[in-house]
Amino acid sequence: MVQLTTIFCKAYHGGHLTIRLALGGCTNRPFYRIVAAHNKCPRDGRFVEQLGSYDPLPNSHGEKLVALNLDRIRHWIGCGAHLSKPMEKLLGLSGFFPLHPMMITNAERLRRRRAREVLLASQKAESEAKETEAS
């Protein structure tokens, strides 16, 4: 019996395996497959294994859907596969890895911006109330 994992885990000449997103879907309706592929292959080209899927457009409940096969992702990382930046972020949000530093920074910026908008809106409402009282 032949073990396929040893065949797939062998060194790939001229590159390495990468876990990345492969674009699918239609115009204005993207859909991504999470795949293990050689880094020299095109983005939507041949891949070794599909590890999940990602739908970036929110559904009717406002959710972006992600399906991951964490056992196989763990296997390919153990075989030396690299991760693309978007995959690092997705796996950080799923709890598989620690959060990517840019995700934390972006969340802090968004929180400050929203707090500033709320403060400006309340100040504007107060100034309008004072103007109506003065009139």
From Swiss-Prot:
Signal peptide: none annotated. It is found in: Mitochondrion. It holds the Pfam family Ribosomal_S16. Residues 1-34 form a transit peptide. InterPro entries: Ribosomal_bS16 (IPR000307), Ribosomal_bS16_dom_sf (IPR023803). GO terms for biological process: mitochondrial translation. Keywords: Mitochondrion, Ribonucleoprotein, Ribosomal protein, Transit peptide. One of its GO terms (molecular function) is structural constituent of ribosome. One of its GO terms (cellular component) is cytosol. It comes from the Eukaryota. Belongs to the bacterial ribosomal protein bS16 family. Component of the mitochondrial ribosome small subunit (28S) which comprises a 12S rRNA and about 30 distinct proteins. PANTHER family: 30S RIBOSOMAL PROTEIN S16, SMALL RIBOSOMAL SUBUNIT PROTEIN BS16M. This is Small ribosomal subunit protein bS16m. It comes from Mus musculus. The lineage of its organism: Eukaryota, Metazoa, Chordata, Craniata, Vertebrata.
